[in-house]
């Protein structure tokens, strides 16, 4: 059963939109893209960042919106880069992250999907545990070439079914269960 309500994904990141669109389409929800730079506070909390972005998106467009904020949290460097993942990727990149790590390579991706309309503000979280590879492998965007999910020998960039196991998929699945039954 396909919902045909207008639901807008607001972001400046077209990669996140394309992944989210593919995932939500498979779950029965049509998504449209509004490219926009949203207000982003500096915070150690993905939830706080996501709430501000969702409210900003709704106030700009006056339409039901979802936004996504995520982070890569690496255990051996106290959860860094965490909510600063985008900035760190732009400045030091995957090579810089690989150069920081010695032995403990445990990491996790966390995604926060936030829905906002006139009366609702809802957060949906997804987490995927894994580790950081020793070298970049595969072709993908962001940290995909260095993140290896638990129970895999391949990086996200090498995995064909990433959209069925990612942190983003888990958060969007929770969102779709709520949205289709609200």
Task: Cite the ranges covered by each PLM segment.
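Anionic-ligand binding patches
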Residues: 2-8, 15-182
């Amino acid at each position: 059963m396909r919902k045909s309500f207008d639901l807008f994904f607001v972001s400046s990141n077209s990669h996140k939109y394309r992944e989210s669109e593919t995932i939500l389409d498979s779950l029965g929800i049509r998504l449209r893209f509004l490219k926009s730079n949203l207000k982003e506070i500096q915070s150690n909390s993905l939830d706080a960042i996501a709430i501000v972005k969702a409210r900003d998106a709704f106030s700009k467009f006056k339409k039901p919106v979802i936004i996504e904020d995520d982070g890569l949290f690496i255990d051996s460097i106290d959860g860094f880069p965490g909510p600063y993942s985008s900035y760190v990727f732009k400045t030091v990149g995957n090579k810089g992250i690989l150069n920081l790590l010695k032995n403990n390579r445990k990491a996790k991706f966390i995604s926060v999907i936030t829905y906002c309309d006139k009366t609702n503000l809802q957060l949906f979280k997804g987490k995927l545990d894994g580790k950081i590879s020793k070298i970049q492998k595969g072709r993908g965007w962001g940290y995909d070439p260095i993140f290896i999910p638990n129970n895999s020998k391949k990086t996200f960039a090498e995995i064909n079914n990433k959209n069925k196991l990612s942190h983003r998929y888990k958060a969007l699945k929770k969102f779709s269960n709520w949205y289709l039954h609200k």
